[in-house]
Amino acid sequence: GSLYERLKTESADEVDVMVVLQFGKKEIIQCDAGIPGFVLLKATETSLLQKYIDADGYIIPEKLRAKWFRGLVDKAVNDIKEKYSGSELELSVHDHGPAVQVDITDVSCGKKLSADLVPTFQLSPTDYYVAKHYKGKSPSSCDYSLLWRQSFSLKEKARLQDMDKEDQGCRHELLRIVKTIMRAETNFAKLTSYHLKTVFLHYNSDSRLQWSPDMLGKRFIEYMEMLYEALAQNWLSHFWLQESVNLFDDIPSKTLENMANRMRKILDNDKERRKVLKYEGKRNSVL
């Protein structure tokens, strides 16, 4: 997530962690689900995962998380509590959607770190599948509760983590500014960090762009224009799966229209732009 990609805009208090389960092809068969970016995973007859399948042999994400993965996390947390009894750190475990959340609280100061642990199957050196719910509208005859989503987190981390290293550019700065603006503007509440990151990946794929710090203002406007176009067209293509997946699929068209209108107002009105660019003294560098 943002912490590992150096895109966090405030102190880190939440992290997502993929917990990789390496079973291999002898225990798991990958099956087409008819939905781009999602698969069905079938346990072989000799697989240890037979306890977590449906009548057709497909691994049920919620069953695996609730009956096995949650137990592993509980045991690990209890072992840590026993080993470090008397510590000022308190650990608690909760269910959080498809993840198991571990809260780590420093009782001496009240600070808390929440870690979402997501069970993940690695089926090849580059293919990872996570237990994340499907929220789209693609027609399919399969049971959505059986779907596993392909994760591109490691590819995204590789692209984003050190992207300013060679030219000391302003890419990270641009994304941090945009994320802060979107968080402060209630109009853009439906835009997630992943939406903003995806627009950036599309924008940054143009190798002709100059990213020296003095270009921050121009890059900001161009990025916002690309985001506006996506909102106005009700379509944001997945960076890795391209046109086969629209990341705005689960956002109502009226909401997208309202966000596009607000974005247009920010881009066309200097006063509105100054109002939203109150970002830790960075306003002048992007005007």
Task: Identify the function of each model-found stretch.
Residues 1-287:
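Non-catalytic helical "accessory" subdomain of NTase-fold nucleotidyltransferases
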